[in-house]
Amino acid sequence: MANKKRSASSSRWLQEHFSDKYVQQAQKKGLRSRAWFKLDEIQQSDKLFKPGMTVVDLGAAPGGWSQYVVTQIGGNGRIIACDILPMDPIVGVDFLQGDFRDELVLKALLERVGDSKVQVVMSDMAPNMSGTPAVDIPKSMYLVELALGMCRDVLAPGGSFLVKVFQGEGFDEYLREIRSLFTKVKIRKPDASRARSREVYIVATGRKL
């Protein structure tokens, strides 16, 4: 019975996925994922990326966000990306495959950043979802806390943080934590984000000294 339920749920998800207009547009444009459109909408409203910036991209695969940011920061910019999954190369992106929760992977990532600070840290990380919020939300909050920890390590004063968060237990506390570290914090729900999804994007700018 459980397998039948999962099969029906998976079929509905696939049907919804391939009928999604942003998935179809991404395929037509040769984009890596529909996440490209989410970031484009955020950039139009919040202007996070500028030529010459250095950006850290956490949870980067398959590369939709990195693919977009390359067009915004230009040839003098740099993206340092990390994901547990493999990602096909993108010109201008220094990709590290590994589990961000692993100390050795984190160390390697920090070494790639080097001594200079970055202007933007962005995270589209998400755990493997079970469909049970009581299980999924704590896993998600753990990942976004790690992303915020990366900000503390590498983000320059005045820098920006963009993070995908699933609303649920711990969300309000996390938001307060971010507000203590940044001068301006907004919550975005891009059109390309499915309406029934709990995901929202926190856009934090002006990292405090």
Swiss-Prot record:
GO cellular component: cytoplasm
Reactions catalysed: uridine(2552) in 23S rRNA + S-adenosyl-L-methionine = 2'-O-methyluridine(2552) in 23S rRNA + S-adenosyl-L-homocysteine + H(+)
Species the sequence originates in: Pectobacterium carotovorum subsp. carotovorum (strain PC1)
Function: Specifically methylates the uridine in position 2552 of 23S rRNA at the 2'-O position of the ribose in the fully assembled 50S ribosomal subunit.
Main location: cytoplasm
Domain of life: Bacteria
NCBIfam families in UniProt: PRK11188.1, rrmJ
Pfam families: FtsJ
Binding positions for S-adenosyl-L-methionine per the UniProt entry: G63, W65, D83, D99, D124
Protein name (record): Ribosomal RNA large subunit methyltransferase E
SUPFAM superfamilies: S-adenosyl-L-methionine-dependent methyltransferases
Protein keywords: Cytoplasm, Methyltransferase, rRNA processing, S-adenosyl-L-methionine, Transferase
Catalytic residues in the record: K164
InterPro entries: RNA_methyltr_RlmE, RNA_MeTrfase_FtsJ_dom, rRNA-MeTfrase_E, rRNA_MeTrfase_gammaproteobac, SAM-dependent_MTases_sf
Molecular function per GO: rRNA (uridine-2'-O-)-methyltransferase activity
Known EC number: 2.1.1.166
Subcellular location: Cytoplasm
Assigned protein family: Belongs to the class I-like SAM-binding methyltransferase superfamily. RNA methyltransferase RlmE family.
Lineage: Bacteria, Pseudomonadati, Pseudomonadota, Gammaproteobacteria, Enterobacterales
